[in-house]
Amino acid sequence: KIIGTPEGFYDEDDPYYFPGAMADRSIEWLHGVRAQDAHKPFFVYYSTGCSHAPHHVANEWADKYKGKFDQGWDKLREEIFARQKELGVVPPDAELTPRNEAFPAWDDVPDKLKPFYARQMEVYAGYSENADHNVGRVINAIEELGELENTLIMWIWGDNGASMEGTVTGSFNELTMQNGIPLTDEMQVQLSERYGGMEQWGASIMAPHYGAAWAWAGNTPFQWGKQVGSHLGGTRNPMVLHWPARTTDAGGLRSQFAHVIDVAPTVLEVAGIPAPRMVDGIEQEPMHGASFVGSLVDYSAPEHRTQQYFETIGNRAMYDDGWLWSCRIQRIPWKFDPETIAHFAPGKWNPDDDPCEL
């Protein structure tokens, strides 16, 4: 359904914010469905832009995290790792992968620039909490309708690992990286000042992205992030499932391997609907995914998937029955300059004139 743009789009006193509008319209739609039919099942696909760049959020959200990241990304990564052990997400004897030399040590960042970097993560955190808040509004609406216990909710946080495309410095405008424009952190600060300074970092006047080392911390315990499909830091995302009517171990963990292509078959099985063979008169290929309903209701269920291939920009991996084969190309995610890309340019030759591929 089209959300539309309100007349007061540029109202400074009450600015329009798309994530909030998404929640408003989703709630409106849910109440409309129930008003028409008290028993009709419903399906909502709520896909927020968060936490993809640009990181846009009002200061009232970002400011909640002032000072929360002054310890820097190295310490933050250690803190996250400790919490993961407490939660049982990683084994108690697991060791944290070391920082790659591509990421600067927080202690090496000049003191005058640390507030610049810390604000980047404050904005990202506020952006993330706002998304969580709006999802919560939709879930509260489902509860108000009396349907929460019997509704399967899949909350998938992301479509890849945290993005390192903000480069080492972070950027007041994410398009600088995409256009191969190298900027130092001091240049980023100077350019930010032209648009109102760091207090405007999450505002609509900028298109900000945080520094790659913050993404590295966010991807704890993994090594890399988005674009590096050879490693779990590039492909793995948290998923929270809520279905009180069928699950009995609230807060339980699952270790069975699953892939995003398994979501649709799972939803169809839960709804008791066969996969469509025809859509708009076009015959459909069989779905490649496999339902994970078994592991959803039983933590000891056997693996439903034993193989999966991954590939992103030449980085590739193969999961096979508990093992992961990986091959990473020697390019870090934020390097798009001509000299770097030249190493990966395709070759060409005429096999008639050059049979030996010289």
Spell out what each predicted region is.
Residues 17-24, 78, 122, 129-136, ...:
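A structural signal for well-ordered alpha-helical segments within the folded catalytic domains
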Residues 38-42, 90, 94-101, 130-168, ...:
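Metal-dependent active-site segment of extracytoplasmic phospho-/sulfohydrolases and closely related
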Residues 1-62, 66, 71, 75, ...:
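Formylglycine-dependent
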